């Protein structure tokens, strides 16, 4: 059956209007292709149908640059959405939004390809996540534990360490977990994707990872859809092979940003702060597909850029509703040189529940937050009147809070070359034990510096003894 053809009517940046003959209008979300277009016949471009305008015209979003495209060019209707290869042949390879390889190693010969637009699992098939996923990062495992098969958000402004955290989590979870992982680079720096690829080769895990990139330099159409490409690959492993898959997305804000860029060109009236009016719908469509079913699970870790450090901005605020755990990276913590710069009072998790993590873990976590909250309340008094005006009880709380703050830091594997400190993976049981001992006052005699950038409490005690020996 021959492909219906249309003609380009108008080109507005990343948006292209196409006219088709009567009775051959392509469906929404179907892919249209331009073959050997442009003056030199060197343009091969995929468009996705976004709107029906009437008069047999459709408005489409381009998945690549429209430079050199001309009105009147022939457009072919593929009569299907964008389809991408899935299954084990995709592992160890790098793809673009269309499922084409971009690592210079030739095409992928996968017997199965799936459309990137799919329905989320039905309510009866969804399996709620209630098991903790150890990350080896103390502040996360203690205060905002991640659920296996859950959705996790890393919130932070510019330059507070979201990508480093994603890379550390890939190191700690993907390498130890041993299952398959999908990494979707959405609108971020190409350099970071390149670094990650080479790190995975060095670590010997590249054959268990598929990487999909639609980076900063690409048109908004590619950045809008690349997360769906990565998700489709993850869904196949979950649904057809019954596996537990890890899906890393860096950065989900760029997905929203790309939608915002395209929205105005599509003629939609902008909503709050200039975002697209369909923001909640687009986010829900993506997030509802990232879930655990009776067959397998997708555990997703999503970095979320927070514009101007404002968590009430519509883009991060819309994402909040979908997450099981939120890890908030704070500039105030970053300025204290505590890394990872996780805000222990803002970060939350649905599974920080005594029935899931255990009574001891829950009580230690709440005890830590209580001490840190009291310290935060006392900071104004300390700033105005000084420490001497505090009661003995408050002085003790301040001393323990400062130790807890420092003990929430730890050396990271992916930052070894910058810090010259070997990275550590701390078992959640050791994390709970360490903070419990600080809360009980067992280490009140040690200097607070002993707790900075160490793994377990035993390492802190050893470091403290060395510091005391140097002083004496």
Curated annotation (Swiss-Prot):
Record-linked PANTHER family: ATP SYNTHASE, ATP SYNTHASE SUBUNIT BETA, MITOCHONDRIAL
Origin organism lineage: Bacteria, Bacillati, Bacillota, Clostridia, Eubacteriales
Cited Gene3D superfamilies: 2.40.10.170, Bovine Mitochondrial F1-atpase, Atp Synthase Beta Chain, Chain D, domain 3, P-loop containing nucleotide triphosphate hydrolases
Name of the protein: ATP synthase subunit beta
Keywords carried by this UniProt record: ATP synthesis, ATP-binding, Cell membrane, CF(1), Hydrogen ion transport, Ion transport, Membrane, Nucleotide-binding, Translocase, Transport
The protein's role, per its UniProt record: Produces ATP from ADP in the presence of a proton gradient across the membrane. The catalytic sites are hosted primarily by the beta subunits.
Gene: atpD
GO molecular function: ATP binding; ATP hydrolysis activity; proton-transporting ATP synthase activity, rotational mechanism
Catalytic reaction equation(s): ATP + H2O + 4 H(+)(in) = ADP + phosphate + 5 H(+)(out)
Keyword flag Membrane: yes
Family: Belongs to the ATPase alpha/beta chains family.
EC number: 7.1.2.2
Quaternary structure and interacting proteins, as annotated: F-type ATPases have 2 components, CF(1) - the catalytic core - and CF(0) - the membrane proton channel. CF(1) has five subunits: alpha(3), beta(3), gamma(1), delta(1), epsilon(1). CF(0) has three main subunits: a(1), b(2) and c(9-12). The alpha and beta chains form an alternating ring which encloses part of the gamma chain. CF(1) is attached to CF(0) by a central stalk formed by the gamma and epsilon chains, while a peripheral stalk is formed by the delta and b chains.
NCBIfam families linked to this entry: atpD (TIGR01039)
Binding, ATP: 156-163
PROSITE patterns: ATPASE_ALPHA_BETA
């Amino acid at each position: 059956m021959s492909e219906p053809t249309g003609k380009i009517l108008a080109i507005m940046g990343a948006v292209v209007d196409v006219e088709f003959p009567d009775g051959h209008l392509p469906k929404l979300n179907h892919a249209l292709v331009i073959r050997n277009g442009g003056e030199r016949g060197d343009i091969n471009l995929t468009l996705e149908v976004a709107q029906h305008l009437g008069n047999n015209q459709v408005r489409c979003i381009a998945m690549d640059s429209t430079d050199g495209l001309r009105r009147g060019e022939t457009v072919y209707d593929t009569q299907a959405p964008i389809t991408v290869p899935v299954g084990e042949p995709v592992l160890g390879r790098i793809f673009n939004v269309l499922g084409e390889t971009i690592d210079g190693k030739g095409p992928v010969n996968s017997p199965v390809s799936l459309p990137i637009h799919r329905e989320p699992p039905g309510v009866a098939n969804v399996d709620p996540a209630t098991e903790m996923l150890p990350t080896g990062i103390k502040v996360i495992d203690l205060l905002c534990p991640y659920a296996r098969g859950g959705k996790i958000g890393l919130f932070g402004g510019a330059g507070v360490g979201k990508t480093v955290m994603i890379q550390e989590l890939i190191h700690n979870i993907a390498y130890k977990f041993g299952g398959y992982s999908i990494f979707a680079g959405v609108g971020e720096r190409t350099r970071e994707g390149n670094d990650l690829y080479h790190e995975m080769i060095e670590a010997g895990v590249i054959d268990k990872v598929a990487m999909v990139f639609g980076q900063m330099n690409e048109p908004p159409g590619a950045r809008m859809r690349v997360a769906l490409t990565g998700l489709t690959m993850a869904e196949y492993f979950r649904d057809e092979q019954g596996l537990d898959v890890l899906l890393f997305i860096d950065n989900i804000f760029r997905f929203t940003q790309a939608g915002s860029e395209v929205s105005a060109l599509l003629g939609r009236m902008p909503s709050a702060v200039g975002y697209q009016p369909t923001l909640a719908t687009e986010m829900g469509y993506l997030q509802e597909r990232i879930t655990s079913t009776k067959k397998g699970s997708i555990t997703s870790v999503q970095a979320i850029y927070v514009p101007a450090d404002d968590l009430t901005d519509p883009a991060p605020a819309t994402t909040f509703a979908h997450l099981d755990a939120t890890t908030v990276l704070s500039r105030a913590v970053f300025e204290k040189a505590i890394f990872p710069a996780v805000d222990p009072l803002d970060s939350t998790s649905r599974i920080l529940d005594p029935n899931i993590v255990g009574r001891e873990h829950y009580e230690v976590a709440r005890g830590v937050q209580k001490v840190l909250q009291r310290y935060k309340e006392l900071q104004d008094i300390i700033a105005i009147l000084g420490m001497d005006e505090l009661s003995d009880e408050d002085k003790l709380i301040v001393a323990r809070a400062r130790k807890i703050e420092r003990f929430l830091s730890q050396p990271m594997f992916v930052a070894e070359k910058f810090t010259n400190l070997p990275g550590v993976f701390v078992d959640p049981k050791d994390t709970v034990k360490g903070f419990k001992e600080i809360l009980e006052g067992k280490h009140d005699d040690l200097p607070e510096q002993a707790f900075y950038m160490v793994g377990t409490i035993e390492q802190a005690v050893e470091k403290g003894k060395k510091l005391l020996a140097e002083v004496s």
